[in-house]
Amino acid sequence: LDEYIDPAKIRTIKHTGKYFSLESRHIVDPSPQRTPFLFQAGTSSAGSEFAATHAEAIFVSSHSPVVLAPKVAKIRALAREKGRDPNSVKFFATFTPVLGVTDEEAEEKYEELKSYASEIGGLVLVSGWTGIDLSKYPPDHVLTADDATEDHRVRSLLDQFTVTSPEVPKWTPRVIAEKASIGGLGPVAVGSPKKVADELERWVREADVDGFNIGYVTTPGSFEDVVELLVPELRRRGIYAEVPEENKDEEWTAREKVYGKGQKGLRDDHEGTRYKYDVYEETEEREQNGKRKLDENEEAAPNGTRAKKQKSST
């Protein structure tokens, strides 16, 4: 009979840790990457510390590159302290483009989209994200840190409301409702492919991000505009590379698309490389051997006391 899997190569995972214990076999096939490409979201203090240790890529969101840049720099610095190449941590910023062949066409499209947007829906969305009931504040109440005293569900998002910028000089429920109804509080760029590409480059330059998590207003319309209008402009600028001709028939993993062909597994400087099956197995066996020796020593000692190693005389 043909075998789908060689049973001799299926290993049992035995783990006992602080938060959970298990003894089982993995239930899915290993991918060419072995460890999935590791995305993380959030730039709070706890999130930044976690990201600097574990994340290969981070979803970030901010209304301004000026506000985002220090957060990116902080995480890169933390990664360096942990022995990682800070540039190996990739940042993908939320970005919603509204595109037209011309700036005028894009503006007309944006005005039409706003006519369908629900500002109340935007407030409900943000209230759910942050745990703050924005409906209890007057529309033009300027939000401050004193208002951020409720259940903090998304701490890094909540922090945005206490940081202003040239793009958003003040945060009020009215401003939040307008921003959240299209773009979800991230940047919205309206214009021709050239204008939107200029804005993308500005974010890369000023915030030090590596890529973008493209938001949409309509589907599939927003994505069709990106493919048909924006991508050709980015390729003309040489900042959105095509797959090399010699590699077009090859399969690329998600990690290779970020780090380059050949980097299927975790980088050598990543924390996860310490956790390989053989290493874990050796550690577990060493711990079990140590426990057996301790038990043997205790059994050999009189009156149930633990045997002590005799000091050697010189």
Features from the language model and the residues they span:
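Glycine- and acidic
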Residues: A52-S61, K179-G186, D208-V217
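C-terminal helical cap(s) of enzyme catalytic domains, especially alpha/beta-barrels
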Residues: A69-A77, T219-I239
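Short, acidic/polar
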Residues: Q40-F50, S192-R205
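Conserved, mostly hydrophobic/aromatic
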Residues: L38, A51, A106, W203, ...
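Long, repeat-rich segments with strong aromatic
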Residues: F37, G47-A57, S62-S64, K71
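Active-site-proximal loop/turn and secondary-structure-junction residues that shape catalytic pockets
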Residues: S44, S64-P65, F95-L99, T218-P220
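An alpha-helical appendage that flanks or caps ligand/catalytic pockets
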Residues: L1-Q33, A69, A79-R202, L234-E298, ...
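Hydrophobic faces of well-ordered beta-strands that scaffold small-molecule active sites
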Residues: P36-A41, E56-V60, V89-T96, F212-I214
